[in-house]
A protein has these predicted regions:
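Transmembrane alpha-helix boundary/anchor motif
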Residues: 13, 90-100, 121, 130, ...
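Transmembrane helix-bundle signature of multi-pass membrane transporters/permeases
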Residues: 74-77, 117-121, 149-152
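A juxtamembrane structural motif centered on a specific transmembrane helix
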Residues: 127-179
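Hydrophobic alpha-helical transmembrane segments
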Residues: 78-95, 113-114, 154
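Loop-to-helix entry and N-terminal half of a specific, functionally important transmembrane alpha helix
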Residues: 99-140, 146
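Alpha-helical transmembrane bundle and helix-membrane interface signal
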Residues: 1-7, 12, 101-106, 163-177
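Hydrophobic, glycine- and aromatic-enriched re-entrant/interface helices and adjoining loop segments
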Residues: 1-81, 108-110
Length: 179
């Protein structure tokens, strides 16, 4: 069953990514190249980073998808450990805020919606960061509100706008019922 999915459904480059991630094959100049360069970029950033637009791995094009899938390694090289922690902290605050909005909802739809948006954001953050540091196979999932790409930004913005609107209507409803 797994063989059928692996050989029939997945494309050859997807199979190579999975095999490379599992350590079955090693291709430092092919399948593993992006992840290896990403790890080098993040590691070379150190604690405070090299400075804005001063990252050598990024500046000289060693990381091919530095503005999309591997944006986190750009932050790691230019802003270091501190910069990556700030980005992760802000994304965590956003996720926690969405969960808090969900707790305030009086209708099941609003609660489920806010929790689902928080779960989607958490999934994207975990997969993207895991991908750039080599803990997950490369999947092409953007880092919310940071990766280049209009459709991702528009989709996440719409998800957040709906959640904020649901929260605002819940607050308005509770204010009207107090008086």
């Amino acid at each position: 069953e797994t063989d059928y999915i692996f050989n029939s459904i997945l494309k050859p480059h997807q199979q190579d990514r999975i095999l490379s991630f599992l350590g079955i094959i090693s291709d430092p100049l092919g399948t593993d190249y992006n992840v290896n360069q990403s790890k080098i970029a993040i590691g070379s950033g150190g604690f405070l980073g090299k400075g804005f637009l001063q990252g050598t791995q990024i500046k000289y094009g060693f990381v091919p998808e530095r503005h999309t899938d591997f944006i986190f390694c750009t932050v790691g090289e230019e802003w270091g450990f501190v910069g990556t922690m700030v980005v992760l902290a802000l994304l965590c605050l956003l996720i926690l805020r969405l969960m808090r909005m969900g707790e305030r909802q009086q209708e099941p739809f609003g609660r489920i919606y806010c929790y689902c948006v928080a779960a989607i954001l958490l999934f994207h953050v975990l997969v993207n960061v895991g991908m750039t540091i080599g803990l997950m196979p490369v999947m092409g999932i953007p880092l919310p509100f940071m990766s280049y790409g209009g459709s991702s930004l528009i989709a996440f913005t719409i998800l957040l706008f709906i959640a904020v609107r649901l929260d605002a209507s819940t607050r308005q409803f509770s204010l009207n019922n107090k008086f």
